[in-house]
Amino acid sequence: AAASATRDELKALLRAVLERSSDMEGPDRSASDRARALYLRGRLVECTADHGDADDAKALLGAEEALKKAAKLNPTLEGAWICLGQLLWRKGNLDGARNCYAAVTARAPNKKASQCMSMLYRTIAKAKAAPGTDEQKTHVLESLKHAKAAIKMDLTDGHSWYQCGMAYMTQFFAEGATDPAKLTQSLQCFSNAEKGGP
């Protein structure tokens, strides 16, 4: 009962914030302000929606549209691209998600986008490539490349180290579990993730 009440309170608060943010989306506002408001609208809905709930599914479509508009109004708004990528990924649109993250990394290095790309390429390797194929290995190498890029941006970020550990472990199995050095590298990355760096 308490969880349900808290969820209802959260939804009421969300509605109030969304109403307030709609004031910032008007034509009298700058494109930058409108983009930021649309991004916040999309992100709030995406973060709080239950992806299995029918009513929330409609709200998620609205969130997707808001994020697309935000990215169109301000293509340099990295958060909008990343949030849109996560939303598309949850819907199973892996190519769309990859395009969103690539839009961010094409402009400048971005740790969050690189972390997302690392996870996404492992998902693509599993979903779109047969085990042990060159295609799968290529996707795994992309995952590893993006994880290493994220680490390079912040040596103390445990999440980046964790992604690198997962990429090495995936590579170990994708290559037939024959190279124990990959497993050792994976374990070292997990250790660095716990410590917050090497």
Residue spans of the language-model regions?
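N-terminal alpha-helical scaffolding segments that mark the starts
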Residues: 1-7
